[in-house]
Design a protein with these regions (language model features):
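Hydrophobic beta-strand positions that form the internal "hydrophobic ladder"
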Residues: 49, 87-88, 127-128, 217-218, ...
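Blade-loop segments of beta-propeller domains
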Residues: 36-38, 54-97, 112
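Beta-strand-rich domains and repeat architectures in extracellular enzymes and scaffolds
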Residues: 2-13, 18-55, 208
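Structural motif
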Residues: 56-59, 94-98, 137-143, 180-184, ...
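Blade/loop signatures of beta-propeller domains
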Residues: 1-24, 174-186, 352-360
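Blade-level signature of beta-propeller repeat domains, shared across WD40, Kelch, NHL, RCC1
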Residues: 380-413
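Asp-box/WD-like beta-propeller blade repeats and closely related beta-sheet repeat scaffolds
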Residues: 74-76, 83, 90-184, 193, ...
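Loop/turn-rich, solvent-exposed surfaces of beta-rich toroidal or solenoidal domains
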Residues: 271, 277-280, 296-364
């Protein structure tokens, strides 16, 4: 990658002295963000990454670092890039728009229900999924009490505080869960504009993710403090099935959280703790065979988010803060971008005849990629693999302002 030097004479590319891996700063404007780790953010062909900046929407060519500004101005919410066309979908003013990166023009593709928000686009770009709250939507007592910006707002170049964790977050989640507000999960057809109510519930539902390969299969989450509920669910949005629970807790204080799809849509992965803050796994479930594999993590390697390489052979973790006020599962010396290589634990002779129906266990062999000792984890790094599997993209405030970075999976020569 070739990039101009950023302000303050900081290098845009360097070898991390603690790990020997090459790091590149992809963004050039302070305050630039990558998307949440489950939101697909690559254009068709996988060569360009979507980033959001104060100016609007940018694309960066991963191989060269070249940045294209493709949309001027703030949009309500970037949903993802389309897996088929590479269009950038966003939700603004009650409508879903598709931005063509080549022409830099947007077109309105669907009108949302009143109070509706779109969260996911399916793999063939025919449906969007979202939710809305039924009836009265103004509940200030349930709103997050986030840190407020300074008078006049943030100025270009100002460090912007991360909004992923804040002092009132856990109490807010308890208030919202207890409220049992009626909600609707809906789909909207991006060709005809037809809206369908798919699920009515008083559970707090969120984190909608369509399968990367199956256009009617949707994963979603029951929100709230994770040890109080069974979180990860699957649903056919064509009405041909009832919601199916992916992981059922069997232990007090057990949690399954931060779920995501494998690149081929075969597996669901999630952060599994048995119990919270004590024993750490990456749980997995094959949606077609029902097979389960639990990958055990060594101490002090728990990460806020995990991700899996496109070929399914490697995993990443974006580390965690040692302060339990920031993360329940506080770990010592875990402020790193990690690479994990899975190793199946070999079955011993004489196992029971029904062992094929049991959970397969594996261990993770860790490697440190990026030293995040100066990163403030109130901003979650949201690490994810590039489509070629050669880089892990993440965001960080480790050098002050929020910027977007990539670390090379292979160690520098």
């Amino acid at each position: 990658m070739q990039n101009p030097a950023p302000a303050a004479n900081l290098p845009r590319e360097w070898i991390d002295p603690a790990t020997g891996h090459r790091i590149v700063q992809l963004s050039t404007e302070p305050g630039t963000n990558s998307l949440y780790f489950t939101q697909y953010a690559y254009t068709a062909g996988g060569t360009k990454l979507l980033m959001t900046s104060r100016r609007g929407i940018d694309l960066v060519t991963i191989a060269t670092g070249e940045i294209e500004h493709v949309h001027e101005g703030h949009v309500g919410r970037v949903i993802q890039t389309g897996r088929r066309t590479g269009a950038i979908y966003y939700d603004q003013g009650g409508f879903v728009y598709a931005l063509d990166p080549a022409t830099r023009t947007s077109r309105q593709v669907a009108k949302l229900p009143s109070n509706g928000t779109a969260f996911a686009i399916n793999c063939d770009e025919t449906l969007a999924a979202g939710s809305y709250t039924v009836g009265e939507t103004d509940h200030p007592e349930l709103a997050p009490r986030r840190p407020q910006p300074p008078p006049g707002g943030y100025k270009p170049g100002d460090p912007m505080p991360g909004g992923d964790n804040y002092p009132d977050k856990h109490a807010m989640m308890d208030r919202r869960l207890a409220a049992r507000l009626p909600m609707v999960l809906f789909t909207v057809n991006l060709q005809s504009g037809e809206c369908k109510d798919v699920l009515h519930t008083t559970d707090w539902i969120d984190h909608f993710q369509f399968s990367p390969s199956d256009p009617t299969l949707l994963m979603y989450a029951h929100e709230g403090r994770q040890w109080k509920l069974d979180r990860v669910w699957l649903l056919r949005v064509d009405g041909k099935s009832q919601p199916m629970l992916v992981h059922q807790r069997t232990m007090r204080m057990e949690i399954a959280v931060h779920e995501y799809w494998s690149n081929d849509g075969q597996w669901i992965y999630y952060d599994l703790q048995t119990p919270l803050s004590e024993d750490f796994w990456i749980g997995s479930y094959n949606v077609y065979s029902g097979k389960r594999i639990w990958y055990h993590l060594p101490p002090n390697h728990w990460s806020v988010h995990y991700n899996t390489s496109p070929d399914g052979t490697l995993f990443s973790g974006d580390g965690s803060d040692p302060d339990p006020a920031v993360h329940y599962a506080a770990q010592k010396d875990a402020k790193w971008i990690f690479l994990f290589r899975p190793e199946l634990i070999v079955n011993q002779p004489g196992e029971t005849p029904d062992q094929e129906n049991m959970i397969q266990v594996a261990r993770m062999i860790p490697e440190r990629l990026v030293d995040l000792s100066k990163h403030d984890y109130s901003l979650e790094p949201n690490g994810n693999f590039t489509p070629d599997g050669k880089w892990i993209v993440f965001r960080s405030n480790m050098r002050g302002p929020i910027e977007v970075y990539a670390v090379e999976v292979a160690k520098a020569k």
